[in-house]
Amino acid sequence: MNYNKKIIHIDMDCFYASIEIRNNPSLKGKPVAVGGKANQRGVLTTCNYEARKFGLHSAMSTSQALKRCPNLILLPVNMSLYKAVSEQIHCIFRRYTDIIEPISLDEAYLDVTACKQHSGSATWIAQAIRQDIWQELQLTSSAGIAPLKFLAKIASDQNKPNGQFVICPEEVADFVKTLPLKKISGVGKVAQEKLAQLGFITCGDIQQADQALIYQQFGKFGQRLWDFCHGIDPREVEPHRPRKSLAVENTLLSDLDTLTEAEDVVKSHYQTLLFRLQRNWGDKPLSDLKKIGIKLKFDDFTQTTLERTTDGIAEHHFLQLLQQIWQRRKGRKIRLIGLNVHFPEEKITKQLNLWE
């Protein structure tokens, strides 16, 4: 694997909440969250670190958040404001490179391999970008610098908030070897438990494993996991890459076999889907979204999908799809449920995060 790329992953710190606090300094030092109202089954879009001390996090239901933190200051989502600030941040990015891959309004990959500023040092470039953002917008950000995309993303979380972390090419092998598998994107709680049962805790453990076993146990994801654990990630930073859909899927903590249980999962996924639509679809009307889909993966690792064009994306539309696709179960247990919504092509104006 060639490690000659210089990739920076920039992640704004508590982006929406930080903008609100910047615009209203009286909120500083208080637990603040941005999200929907509790009586409307809302969820938190983001919250600041004061709120996180109470165990609050993005995508948590607002009602649960208020139980944990009764003094929480809950602010409505102001997407037009966040988009405007995001564009200001991207203007700063473009001073250093045109190779920018936005992940969401508050997160992006930058390829600065060809950048000559600051003697071509990706570390100094990242520091300069973060300094520009702070001086001009009074917002903090964190950065990860590495020759591979997946490592840059992991690195950006190492010194949050308002910090950065560098993984040099010559450090990749040692860093990856000791990297906990739970740090890798896609290794959720269920996958982590399964890996632990097989004796895999770090990437180094996977390096000593049989490749066929990893592929057999984890399918397509196992191929990516194997590559990452061996310091392989050929993905380029892709500017202006339009995505056509947004989805939510999770492997369940335990397999289920009743429609009632599946309906509860769909209802939970639907709230997460709305949360992600807030971040990625913005303030455009949800009525523009007509095509939805559902996916079931069974305990024999086969899967089936069903898509429909509807008159909206209300919760009951997904529940209807579930009832229709349920007939395909044929006695098998369900290990994964996924929901997705397709974006009209003429509405796609920027990259959207798929299966985020």
Swiss-Prot record:
Domain (UmuC) spans 7-188
Q: Where is this site: Substrate discrimination?
A: 16
Free-text remark on how the cofactor is bound: Binds 2 magnesium ions per subunit.
Q: Active-site residues?
A: 107
Would you kindly state one Gene Ontology biological process term found in this protein's UniProt entry? error-prone translesion synthesis
* Chief localisation class: cytoplasm
User: What Gene3D superfamilies does the annotation carry?
Assistant: 3.30.70.270, 3.40.1170.60, 5' to 3' exonuclease, C-terminal subdomain, DNA polymerase, Y-family, little finger domain
Q: What class of enzyme is it?
A: transferase
Q: What keywords sit in the KW lines?
A: Cytoplasm, DNA damage, DNA repair, DNA replication, DNA-binding, DNA-directed DNA polymerase, Magnesium, Metal-binding, Mutator protein, Nucleotidyltransferase, Transferase
Q: Which cofactor does it need?
A: Mg(2+)
Q: Name one GO cellular component term.
A: cytosol
- Catalysed reactions, semicolon-separated: DNA(n) + a 2'-deoxyribonucleoside 5'-triphosphate = DNA(n+1) + diphosphate
Repeat keyword on record: no
Tell me the GO molecular function terms: damaged DNA binding; DNA-directed DNA polymerase activity; magnesium ion binding
Enzyme nomenclature, EC number: 2.7.7.7
Annotated binding of Mg(2+), by residue: 11, 106
Tell me where in or outside the cell this protein is found: Cytoplasm
The record's annotation in InterPro entries points to: DNA/RNA_pol_sf (IPR043502), DNA_pol_Y-fam_lit_finger_sf (IPR036775), DNA_pol_Y-fam_little_finger (IPR017961), DNA_polymerase-Y (IPR050116), DNApol_IV (IPR022880), IMS_HHH_1 (IPR053848), Rev_trsase/Diguanyl_cyclase (IPR043128), UmuC (IPR001126)
Q: Spell out the PANTHER family in the cross-references.
A: DNA POLYMERASE KAPPA, DNA REPAIR POLYMERASE UMUC / TRANSFERASE FAMILY MEMBER
Q: Which family does the similarity line name?
A: Belongs to the DNA polymerase type-Y family.
Instruction: State whether it acts alone or in a complex, and with which partners, per the record.
Output: Monomer.
HAMAP family (UniProt xref): DNApol_IV
The name under which this protein is listed is: DNA polymerase IV
